Structures are given as C-alpha cells and as structure tokens.
C-alpha cells in the first residue's frame, strides 16, 4: 500500500521495451508486445524525470489521453489532442491506505466520484475499446475494496507515550483543522487549501488548471467520466496522516526528506541525496524520514549522471520545498511532541 518513493523514471524506457519481446515466438504474443512497445515509445518523452523517486503519473495520463478517441477509446498513432509538455511536474505517490479516508484521489482535488474508474485509466496504455474497459470494470470494485481495506504498518520502535499525548494536544490545536483527527472517532475535513495560503510549489496545481480544457475534459466526457470526475482545484488537499511516518519524502513533490524538516522550514535542504535503500539504517527514526546527506550544489553543478539522478534539487521548476510553514510557529518542544504523536497514527 505504500507508493514507491524510489521509482526510477530517469531513463528512456523505449529501448528496453523493444528488447523485451525478442524471445517471443507466438504470433499473438508478438502482436501484443509490439502494441505495448509502440505505446511506450509514444509516451516515453513525457515520463522521463531528472531524479529518482519523482513520478510522472499526471503527464503519462495526459499523453495517453492525447492518443485516445474519447468516445471509442481507440488508439491513434497521431495525437488527437495537443500533447503535454515533456518536462513533467513531479508527484510523490500517496500511500494507498489513505484512500478510504478522503473523497479525492489526487493532490489538486481532482479524482472524485467512482475512484475505480479513475484508477482504471492506468489501463489506457493498452485497452483499445469500451468493451475491454468494461471487462476490467466488472472486477475493479474488488480491487477498490481491497485498497480500502489496507491499513498502515505500526511504528516499529518504542514510543514515549507521555510525549505523544502532549503532541496530540498540540496537533489537535494546530494541525487537525486541515489534516483531521484520529483515534476512536476520527474525522477528516477534506479541504482544498488555496495556493496563497499553503505556499507550496504551485507547478502541479498550475499545470492541472492550464491543461484542464484538454485532458480533464477528455476524461469527464469519456466512458471513464460516466462515474468518476476530474475537477482539479487551485490548491492542494492536506492528506490524512495515518501511517505518515512511513511515507517520506513529504509535500506533493517529495521535496522534503523528513517530517522534522516539514515542521521546521529552516531545516529543509536546498540540495540533498539519500541512499534509496529501505533498511532500518536508511531511515531516520528521530526526524521521521530518510537519512539525508546535504550537498552544496544542484544538478547544474553535478557532472556525474549517477550522482545527479540521486540528487534532489529544489531549485528545479516544480521541485520547490517552500510553503507549509505552519510548524515554524511551534516551539522546539512542541514540534518534538508532535513528531512523537505522529508515530502513533
């Protein structure tokens, strides 16, 4: 249920797509492979990212929609809509276990109604008819039910119960109005916070608004939009925080490596890297996030590609780590208490 925060979209996938099917001999399998490889080639310019962990999901969906007939879902080698920009805005994939607590799937408030139909757009890479989509739709309620049943893993280390209880009081006074309450009677306000208020990198929300006339309208007018709706807003949704300790990095673009830095903007590095491992030694149990190495330069100053793709540069467009400065007003003791409380969610 946890999004892959280390997924690698830094390479052109079209070369490997062409190689995958060389050992096939069955004509039907070869035809399916060639169809898939051709679509990988068509979309690959729109899903290549400069850093590991940055996900191009929104751009991929837009590129797929551009090649699809909205009524029949038939693939067109010639784009039917203007294609999205090749520089994809990054998103950090949310944990699936938050899905049951919110009405919108996406950071910008889009993806309401039947989430199953929205999830199914991932199949538009190879689904070519409404009949094929309906066959998937027949069993997708079970997929949706499974995803809604997911729960976060418990914090694997000791918790200071007294400190966590003090943190709950601070959290409910300062954070709950946006992120909800937890415990026996949980609540979630399901708000969209305007960009001017939250102050986080605006590129994702701005892009959703800019291309809505093409891609949002395509979805809402298609078979998928008969039950689901894409209605992006000019702001971001504060996520539910169940299992938040396990979901680093933070903000919608993954620009902040730890919750400690999220609660104190002075701790946020402009340029940082990590091991991209998943062992206990790769996790910072004090700061709640990844063990991070701060560096003194961004992508422009890193000639080695292997190092560059592991370097998060917050000066790149769409990768900014500003905003969400609400925790700056807390004392150090209050922030420590909130961190302890978040371990219990």
For the regions a language model picked out, list residue spans one by one:
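Periplasmic c-type cytochrome electron-transfer domains
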Residues: 1-345
């Amino acid at each position: 249920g946890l999004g892959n925060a280390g997924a690698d979209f830094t390479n052109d996938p079209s070369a490997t797509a062409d190689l995958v099917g060389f050992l096939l001999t069955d004509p039907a399998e070869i035809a399916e492979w060639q169809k898939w490889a051709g679509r990988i080639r068509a979309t690959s310019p729109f899903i290549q990212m400069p850093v590991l962990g940055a996900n191009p999901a929104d751009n991929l969906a837009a590129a797929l929609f551009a090649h699809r007939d909205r009524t029949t879902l038939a693939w067109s080698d010639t784009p039917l809509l203007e294609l999205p920009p090749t520089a994809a805005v990054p998103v950090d994939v949310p944990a699936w276990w938050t899905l049951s607590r919110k009405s919108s799937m996406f950071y910008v408030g889009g993806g309401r109604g039947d989430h199953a139909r929205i999830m199914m757009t991932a199949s538009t890479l190879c689904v070519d008819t409404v009949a094929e989509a309906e066959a998937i739709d027949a069993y997708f309620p079970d997929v949706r039910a499974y995803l809604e049943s997911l729960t976060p893993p418990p914090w694997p280390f000791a918790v200071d119960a007294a400190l966590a209880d003090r943190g709950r009081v601070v959290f409910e006074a300062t954070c709950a109005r946006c992120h909800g309450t937890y415990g026996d009677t949980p609540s979630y306000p399901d708000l969209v916070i305007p960009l001017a208020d939250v102050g986080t990198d605006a590129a994702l929300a701005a892009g959703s608004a800019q291309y809505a006339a093409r891609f949002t309208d395509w979805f809402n007018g298609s078979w998928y939009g008969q039950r689901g709706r894409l209605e992006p807003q000019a702001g971001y949704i504060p996520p539910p925080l169940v299992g938040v300790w396990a979901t680093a990095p933070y903000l919608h673009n993954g620009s902040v490596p730890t919750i400690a830095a999220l609660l104190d903007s002075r701790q946020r590095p402009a340029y940082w890297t990590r091991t991209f491992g998943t062992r206990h030694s790769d996790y910072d149990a004090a700061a709640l996030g990844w063990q991070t190495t701060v560096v003194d330069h961004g992508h422009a100053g890193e000639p080695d590609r292997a190092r560059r793709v592991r370097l998060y540069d917050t000066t790149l467009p769409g990768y900014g780590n500003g905003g969400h400065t609400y925790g700056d007003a807390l004392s150090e003791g209050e922030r420590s208490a909130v961190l302890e409380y978040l371990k219990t969610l």
